C-alpha cells in the first residue's frame, strides 16, 4: 500500500490525478501539466515534496563525519543556514544519492535526501556515522512544500508572520532559516526563485489552502519533471545512480578535490576516473518535429573518425522553448552536432551545455 503525505486530501480536493511514485501517492497533475509548468515560469506554483526525507544530525563530530561521507566539502559551510549540494558516493565512486546539507551549528547539520533512495540512504548514513557518535533524527513530523516562480517568494510571504518576513529578507539562494514553526529555504528544483518550506505535519493542509488563496497554483510531478529538465537538473535513477560517477553526470563541480589530504568515500575511484577519462553529460536540442525520449541512442563521429554512441537519460518537449530537449550521457569527444535514432528516422540534434532555461529565459 502506497503511503500518503499529510497533503493527500488537499490534492484530491484540488482535482489531482494521483499516481504511485516510489511508494508514495503523489499528484501527477491537477488537470493541465502545461498550465502548471507555465505558472512556475511566469508566476508562482507549488509542489508537495513531503515524500522527501529530512534528516537532522547532531554531535560534536558532525562536520568531520560529513567531510568523510560527502564528495563536496562541508568545510565551506561557515555561515548559519548556508546549504551545499553534494553527491553521497559509494567506494567505487557511484552516486548513492544527491542531497542538500544545511549548516546550523558545529553540532547540528540537516540533510534533505530523495524519497526513492530513503531506506538505503538512512542505512548508509547510519552505518558510517557510528564511529563519530552522531545522533540521527529522521524528521517524519515535517511536511515540505516548494513554492517556485518569479512571484513565488512575494506570494508566500503573505502567509508569513512579521518575524518570518524579517528572517528571510534579503536571504541569498541556498540558505535556510528556522523562523517560528517554519523552516524556509531559498532552494528549489525548477530553475526559478522560490522557497522550500518545512512545517509540522498538522500545519501543512492549512498552509497549502492559504497558498491556493494567495494565487499559487498547485503543480504535480509532470510539471516538476519538465521544469527540472529545462533547468538541467539531474533526476536520481536517470542521470545518475550507484553505477554512474558524478563525473559522468555533470556533477564534477560538486566534488571538492582540495584540500588534497581530505579523505572522502569514493575519492580514490574518482581520481582514477579523472586520470583515465570518463563519459560526460550533455544537452541536446532538436528543433525539428518529434520528441527526444529517455533511452534513445545518440550517435556521433569523434575527431579520430570513430563512431561513438551514448544514450538519452531524460528527454521531453520543452513547454517554455517550444521544441524538444534532452540530457544525454555520451563518450568524451562529442562535437556540436549528433544523430538521435527515433524509430526508423535519424534525427539531427544540436549539442549544448546541459542546461536550457534559467529564470524563464532560454540559455541553450
UniProtKB/Swiss-Prot annotation:
GO biological process: glycine decarboxylation via glycine cleavage system
Keywords tagged on the record: Aminotransferase, Transferase
Reactions that this protein is recorded to catalyse: N(6)-[(R)-S(8)-aminomethyldihydrolipoyl]-L-lysyl-[protein] + (6S)-5,6,7,8-tetrahydrofolate = N(6)-[(R)-dihydrolipoyl]-L-lysyl-[protein] + (6R)-5,10-methylene-5,6,7,8-tetrahydrofolate + NH4(+)
Domain of life: Bacteria
EC number: 2.1.2.10
GO cellular component, one term: glycine cleavage complex
UniProt record similarity statement: Belongs to the GcvT family.
Role this protein plays: The glycine cleavage system catalyzes the degradation of glycine.
Stated name of the protein: Aminomethyltransferase
Natural source organism: Salmonella paratyphi B (strain ATCC BAA-1250 / SPB7)
Lineage: Bacteria, Pseudomonadati, Pseudomonadota, Gammaproteobacteria, Enterobacterales
Protein encoded by which gene: gcvT
